[in-house]
Amino acid sequence: MFRRKRTYNWTMVDIHNHMLFGVDDGAKTLEMSLQMLKMAFESGTQKVVLTPHYSPRRGKAPYKLILRNYEILKERVAQEIPGLSLYLGREVYYLSNVFEDIDKVEDSDVDMTDYEWGTMNDVKNDFREKDLKAIRMCGTKNMIIEFSAMTDIDTIRRGISDCFMSGFQPIVAHVERYVCIVKDPLLIADLREMGAYIQINADSIMGVNGPQVKKCVKKLLSEEFVDFVASDAHNLTSRKPILSEARDYVSKKYGEIYAQNIFRNNAIKLLVLEK
């Protein structure tokens, strides 16, 4: 029996993705960025916070380069996808000295000559910032932080504590990737009590990352431990910038009010985005 696809009168916000070109292991070119953003927009995402990696393995592009590419992309988006709004953040990979590393170097030290992500130049230039504003979400105190998949819960707690001590509100990225959380999803309750916000990936809701991860995600959703669902998009194929399928699933299984909160409202409130 044919069933008409449900329509929604609210759009979504993607707070974690790698759609900014030429700065990490996500979009490679300006045209690829535009294709990804068009795909996101056509599937119901109206606001996108671009979050390039700050990671030893996945990219530490100089902030000047990130800003330059961001402004180039914004100009093209205004011309080609006028209903889409772009914002800028950063996804920070937690290491014990990460905040000292960011704080101790000057942006003026950066030499972007022949910069190319994935080269030794990337490692040598590192992340040169005069202060910590460069990794804030849309200029707020919020910051996305990620950990190694094998990180133990004590390290995650320490990372959250370090964020607060450095003046940030942590948003823990894709918590369903961490083995300790997959084994015991209720550990998230402790992280939330510390004040951390919790983000999961849309494809994990749909089972793309395996049955154990999906089981973990279902537990987190049933307990309403999730604050944000994001795409964590890196490309147009295996890691697409599409939230709509996960939104449909969550709306049906856990209610549209909760879905609207974790796909839109929480991001609007937290990041002080225009409604």
List where the protein language model places each region.
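Extended substrate/RNA-proximal surfaces in nucleic-acid metabolism proteins
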Residues: 60-199
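Mid-to-C-terminal alpha-helical segments outside catalytic/metal-binding sites
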Residues: 3, 243-275
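Charged helix-capping and loop-helix junction motifs
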Residues: 29-32, 65-67, 157-158, 183-189, ...
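Active-site neighborhood of phospho(di)ester-bond hydrolases with catalytic His/Asp-centered motifs
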Residues: 13-15, 49-51, 87-90, 171-173, ...
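Active-site mouth loops of central-metabolism enzymes
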Residues: 19-30, 144-151, 205
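Non-catalytic positions within long, well-ordered alpha-helices that form the structural scaffold/packing
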Residues: 41, 164, 221-222
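Short acidic/histidine-rich active-site segments
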Residues: 53, 225-241
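An N-terminally biased module of ancient metal coordination in phosphate/nucleic-acid-related enzymes
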Residues: 1-83
